[in-house]
Amino acid sequence: QLMSWVFDGEKSPDKIEIETSDQWRTITDEDESYAIWIGHATYLINNGDINILTDPIFSKRASPIGFAGPKRMIPPVMSMKDLPKIDVVVVSHNHYDHLDMYSLKKLYKINPETIFLVPMGDKKRLIKAGLTKVHEMRWWESMEVARSTIHFTPVQHWSKRGLFDRNKSLWGGWFFETSDLKLY
């Protein structure tokens, strides 16, 4: 069976249909807290204070080159043009499906005032791409943005973007806190 799988070209299981929703279009109160799954690890979060985007990937492939690499199976539920003004973008680690330079550059072009929070070791890549408000975070570091505190926490994972850079930068999770809401 293994040989059949290898030689017959069946590389992935049957596609699973995932129903997406456009209910996000009904959100009208900008002060209302919400989280919208856009796709993969990308969430749009409004914590009643700021708009946060996590690990934005809007590309068709997660790869250093646009024509090869893992292809997106499910399109994002909203496009970048549908997004509200993004105050903060957080990146959990530097794998191509979480740190998508195409998406980050486009978000920066839409709003150069966006703050980008990245793990220690990844700032240089974003600065080289022309982004300006980039802050590196170590584990347990926090940053105040408006009335929100954003904490960078350790998680069990790793970082790697090339052949020889395994764990040369940090990776982690994000904890968002206001006086009314705590979200991990």
Where on the chain are the PLM-derived regions?
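Catalytic core of the metallo-beta-lactamase
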Residues: 42-48, 144-184
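Short, polar loop motifs at secondary-structure junctions
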Residues: 39, 119-125, 138
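Metallo-beta-lactamase
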Residues: 1-71, 76-82, 177-184
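Active-site environment of divalent metal-dependent phosphoester hydrolases
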Residues: 95-99, 123-125, 141-144, 158-160
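Binuclear metal-ion centers of metallo-dependent hydrolases, dominated by the metallo-beta-lactamase
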Residues: 115, 130-146
